[in-house]
């Protein structure tokens, strides 16, 4: 019989989270997305897309100086449109539990619509996620962006996790 052992991962849970948002408008979708990343402050990082869990006790801070090219765990949403005059939006929220031993929830949402509509929706999503778990919310923090399309427009919002 084969002996089993615990798997050890070289990763530690990040202990900070930064909410960022940006917009871009360019001649093609990828450059619009890249411009939105740059305007949010994380355009020179390698984003590793994660699901929507904030590690317990992680601290929400302004975006720190992260070395270019770093692999950064990130939950994000974005909306791209080619329709001139259309407004696109993206938002992200973080719900922090009253019980600090529990994880927080990160919710992302994108839409054709306004920044306000998007941010309201993403905050409701955070409330719903806590309700499904039977947890009490201490605080919800959110950010959103909107872009009215000229060429090809992109709205972007993210929660970048990092280490203190």
UniProtKB/Swiss-Prot annotation:
Annotated signal sequence range: none
Coiled-coil residue windows: none
Modified residues (Pyruvic acid (Ser)): 52
Cofactor note: Binds 1 pyruvoyl group covalently per subunit.
Site residues, Cleavage (non-hydrolytic): 51-52
SUPFAM superfamilies: Pyruvoyl-dependent histidine and arginine decarboxylases (SSF56271)
The protein, known as: Pyruvoyl-dependent arginine decarboxylase
UniProt organism field: Methanococcus vannielii (strain ATCC 35089 / DSM 1224 / JCM 13029 / OCM 148 / SB)
Originating gene: pdaD
């Amino acid at each position: 019989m084969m002996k089993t052992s615990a798997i050890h991962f070289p990763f530690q849970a990040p202990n900070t989270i930064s909410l960022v948002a940006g917009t871009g408008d360019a001649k093609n979708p990828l450059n619009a997305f890249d411009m939105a990343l740059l305007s949010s402050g994380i355009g020179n990082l390698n984003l590793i897309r994660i699901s929507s869990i904030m590690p317990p006790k992680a601290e929400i801070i302004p975006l720190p100086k992260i070395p270019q090219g770093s692999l950064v765990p990130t939950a994000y949403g974005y909306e791209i449109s080619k329709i001139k005059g259309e407004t696109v939006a993206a938002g992200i929220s973080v719900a922090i539990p009253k019980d600090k031993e529990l994880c927080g929830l990160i919710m992302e949402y994108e839409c054709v619509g306004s920044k306000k509509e998007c941010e309201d929706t993403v905050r409701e999503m955070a409330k719903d996620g806590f309700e499904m778990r039977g947890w009490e919310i201490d605080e919800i923090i959110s950010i959103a962006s909107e872009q009215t399309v000229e060429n090809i427009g992109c709205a972007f919002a993210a929660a970048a996790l990092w280490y203190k």
